[in-house]
Amino acid sequence: VTVDCSGYPKPDCTLESFPLCGSDNQTYSNKCAFCNAAVERNVTLRHLGEC
């Protein structure tokens, strides 16, 4: 599973809840929060859902 993070980082994310687990073992609340971290800190997707 991959997530398209083109167009990120974004200054504001919605409060939409769609958890994603990052390679840093942190649960991100949604795609926007995950993609901001992916772009800024080179985090990759571990799996969909909470870590």
From Swiss-Prot:
SUPFAM superfamilies to which the protein is assigned, alphabetical: Kazal-type serine protease inhibitors
Any one of the GO CC terms: extracellular region
GO molecular function terms noted in the UniProt entry: serine-type endopeptidase inhibitor activity
Entry keywords, A to Z: Disulfide bond, Glycoprotein, Protease inhibitor, Repeat, Secreted, Serine protease inhibitor
Gene3D superfamilies linked: 3.30.60.30
Key word Disulfide bond present: yes
Domain of life: Eukaryota
InterPro entries, A to Z: Kazal-type_SerProtInhib (IPR050159), Kazal_dom (IPR002350), Kazal_dom_sf (IPR036058)
Span of domain Kazal-like: 3-51
Entry-linked CDD domains: KAZAL_FS
Predominant location: secreted
Record protein name field: Ovomucoid
Protein source organism: Rhynchotus rufescens (Red-winged tinamou)
